[in-house]
Amino acid sequence: MDRRRMPLWALLLLWSPCTFSLPTRTATFERIPLKKMPSVREILEERGVDMTRLSAEWGVFTKRPSLTNLTSPVVLTNYLNTQYYGEIGIGTPPQTFKVIFDTGSANLWVPSTKCSRLYLACGIHSLYESSDSSSYMENGSDFTIHYGSGRVKGFLSQDSVTVGGITVTQTFGEVTELPLIPFMLAKFDGVLGMGFPAQAVGGVTPVFDHILSQGVLKEEVFSVYYNRGSHLLGGEVVLGGSDPQHYQGNFHYVSISKTDSWQITMKGVSVGSSTLLCEEGCAVVVDTGSSFISAPTSSLKLIMQALGAKEKRIEEYVVNCSQVPTLPDISFDLGGRAYTLSSTDYVLQYPNRRDKLCTLALHAMDIPPPTGPVWVLGATFIRKFYTEFDRHNNRIGFALAR
């Protein structure tokens, strides 16, 4: 395959990508190993990049609907903070790509060899080459997803896609325009949306729906485990069931509150013993593609006030690291049960930071109606609570991770 080589300056700039374990197959369900890598934000923080200036110049890298799309994808994932990636194959023979498994979207896309050399980010990622695949079929329809001030743009193609040992024929995006930020520093190549068909740009049937149509899974569910440790073995996605080795007790299920979205209703947010928000109910999406917990700005300010946190710069609230052991718990009422995060769950400590400040893994995100306002429970929450997404019963299950 004629893949683009990473320029020498890029090799010096970036850390080397990590090698992924191959998926292992069982008789009842499929496992996709995940690895945890430094997020783009962490890389920039360690290099002393001013995130305030970066945000002003490049915008917030949160996906929003394509202006040319007739559907309305949920506006969720902030890929600037994403850390967990798995491996899939596209084509015959398979071409390997590292992707985010993202419940906040429904499309699969990867960079293409047809990406212009003007887009430097394409040069450091694995690129799909259709001529190397005997199972490729041309589609050619335009494909666009907007990200703040940038966009991911290309065209649709069809080929065999292998996920966790299961192969389906899939329409996906070949990306030919890839923004420099955040993808120049991102360790993942593309995104595999695990959302519902109504969220898909271009009316494409999502990968998981194609898998369900084969009837090969024991159950019409998938589950996500994110390791809380700092090592690279970051967790796993299980198709068709869940893995009791990674959770304790039983699942508590909450029905989805919005058709065709992994959205549920939250009936309270407490800091310490005080319920501050959402007693009348708030919409919340459980999003595997987001690293942090996101809330409307007005709600986040109340939480930060209760925690005594200060806004250091755009999208970053901090506390003195010496305060972390004394910070109160934050609890989320989901389906009549409190899911509690301690300060060690929601505070990030960067070892190389010199100002002795710790960052809170909560961000502001304001989404206008009709989609919003909405909260997002990302990896900060999922690391504590093993999560099962049940398509058959339209519900999400939570169990304490271990």
Swiss-Prot record:
GO terms for cellular component: apical part of cell; extracellular region; extracellular space; membrane. Residues 1-21 form the signal peptide. Kidney. Disulfide bonds join 115-122, 278-282, 321-358. One of its GO terms (molecular function) is endopeptidase activity. Its EC number is 3.4.23.15. It holds the Pfam family Asp. It is found in: Secreted; Membrane. Changing residue 68 to I: In allele Ren-1D. Coiled coil: none annotated. Glycans are attached at residues 69, 139, 320. One of its GO terms (biological process) is response to immobilization stress. Changing residue 160 to V: In allele Ren-1D; requires 2 nucleotide substitutions. Interaction with ATP6AP2 results in a 5-fold increased efficiency in angiotensinogen processing. It catalyses: Cleavage of Leu-|-Xaa bond in angiotensinogen to generate angiotensin I. Residues 22-71 form a propeptide. Residues 84-399 form the Peptidase A1 domain. The active site is at 102, 287. Induction: Renal renin is synthesized by the juxtaglomerular cells of the kidney in response to decreased blood pressure and sodium concentration. The keyword Zinc-finger does not apply. Renin is a highly specific endopeptidase, whose only known function is to generate angiotensin I from angiotensinogen in the plasma, initiating a cascade of reactions that produce an elevation of blood pressure and increased sodium retention by the kidney. This is Renin-1.
